[in-house]
C-alpha cells in the first residue's frame, strides 16, 4: 500500500486511538516512524513502547520542522483540528513539499485497495451524521450478521479500523462486510474512500469550533460518498438532501431516501400510519419488474408514472428501541443492508431483536409509572430535539453542560410541546435558560446532577419521563458522558430505594 517506497518515513501526528492504530499499521509494514503529540507524555505512549514499536517520539507544539529528515507521509489523528494554526502551518508545509497527509480512514481505504489485488473484495457500508451514528452502525452490523455474513464493525464506534483490519489479517478471518461509523473528523481527510453504500442520518450544528463553520462541517460529512456509492439520505433533513444528485444527472449514483413520512419514490423507505398503527414501509412501483433486491432498482427516469404502493415491513412498535428517531435509524440500517443485496427476511427479524446502545435514549428504570431515560450521549442540540420528539410523552428534561458554542433555539419548539419542566445544570445553563424563557415551561437551576434528578422526580407525574439529554458536552462537570450517565443512574437508584421500588 506504500507503492514502491521501501521502509518509508512516516510522521504520525497525535497519539490517540486512531494515531496509535496508524503507528501500529505502519510499523507492521516496516515503516520508520516519528510520532508527535502536543502532550509531552500522552497516555498511549506507554502502550506504544510496551508493544516494542520502534519510533522517535517528539512532544510539544507542532512545527514544520517535524517534516525534516525525509518524511514521506503524514498520518493525522482525527481529533486534531485543521484550523489550529500550528497544525495548519505544518500541513501547508507538507503540501508544499508534496508529502501526502492521510487520516486513518485513508490508510484503511488504501489497505483495502492493496488487499484487493489479492482478490479480497468485501462490501463496505459507512454511516455518518450528527446523531444516531452508533445506534445505526451497531444495528447495521447486526442485520448483516443475521444474514449470514462475517461482519466487522469499526471506526468511531471502536475499535479503530486499522486495528480491526490487522486482527482480521492475523486471524485469517477477513470479513465479508465492513460496517464503519465515521465522524466528520475522520472524514475530513478522506481522499479515495468509496464504500458500496453510505448513509448520512442528519446534519445539525456540532463541532463548529473544530470545522469553523456549519458548511465546512456538512461538507466533511459528504466525503463519505465515492463516485459510485449508493447514497442513503434522510429526506426529512434539508442539509442532508443537498447531497442528492440533481434529477436527470448523467451517471448519477444510486440514491435511496428514508424518513418519517410515507415514501413516494420507488425503493424509498418511511413510515405509514393506519388505524393508529405506524408501519415501517418501502415504496414499491407496482409496474416495476420483480428483482431480488428492490433497493438496487434504478429509478425510471423516462415518462413512466410509477404506481406506488406502500409495502409494509413491520410495525414500528415491534422495534425494541424507542422513539421516532430510532425508527428512522432502523430504516437507514435496513436500506444499507438491502443496498448490498441482502435478503429482507433475516433483516426484519434482526430489527426486532436489536435492543439499542447504552446512554442513547435508554430507559434505565420505571418507578411509580415514571420512566427514567439515560440519553447522556445527547451531547448536542439535535440529539436532544430527537429524544424529545421521539419519546413523544410529557417529560421533565435535565439539560446543560458545555454547549460548545451551539445555538439552543431549536430546543424551543419541542420543549414547549413536550416538557413539564426543565432542570438546568452546568456551564451553559444560563444560555439555555435565556433561550427557553419564551416557552413558559418552568425552569430550575441546579448545582449538581443529583439534585436535578431528585427535583425532576418530584415534578414528574405518572406516564411522564425524566430524561437526561443534556444537549451539551460533559467535561465541565464530568470525566465524560459515561461518567455523567453513571451519576444519573446512581441518583435514580436512590429514588427507587426511597420509594421502595426496584430500578
From Swiss-Prot:
> Which InterPro entries does the annotation name?
Mur-like_cat_sf, Mur_ligase_C, Mur_ligase_C_dom_sf, Mur_ligase_cen, MurD
Keyword ATP-binding in the entry? The reply is yes
Q: What is its main location?
A: cytoplasm
SUPFAM superfamilies per the UniProt record, alphabetical:
MurCD N-terminal domain, MurD-like peptide ligases, catalytic domain, MurD-like peptide ligases, peptide-binding domain
According to its UniProt entry, the protein's GO biological process terms are: cell division; cell wall organization; peptidoglycan biosynthetic process; regulation of cell shape
- EC number(s): the record gives 6.3.2.9
Compartments where found: Cytoplasm
Q: Name one Pfam family in it.
A: MurD-like_N
Q: Which reaction does it catalyse?
A: UDP-N-acetyl-alpha-D-muramoyl-L-alanine + D-glutamate + ATP = UDP-N-acetyl-alpha-D-muramoyl-L-alanyl-D-glutamate + ADP + phosphate + H(+)
Keyword list, A-Z: ATP-binding, Cell cycle, Cell division, Cell shape, Cell wall biogenesis/degradation, Cytoplasm, Ligase, Nucleotide-binding, Peptidoglycan synthesis
Record region (Disordered): 289-308
Q: Does the keyword Transmembrane apply?
A: no
**One Gene Ontology term of the molecular function aspect:** ATP binding
Question: What is its pathway?
Answer: Cell wall biogenesis; peptidoglycan biosynthesis
Family from the record: Belongs to the MurCDEF family.
- The identity of this protein, by name, is UDP-N-acetylmuramoylalanine--D-glutamate ligase
The gene designation is murD
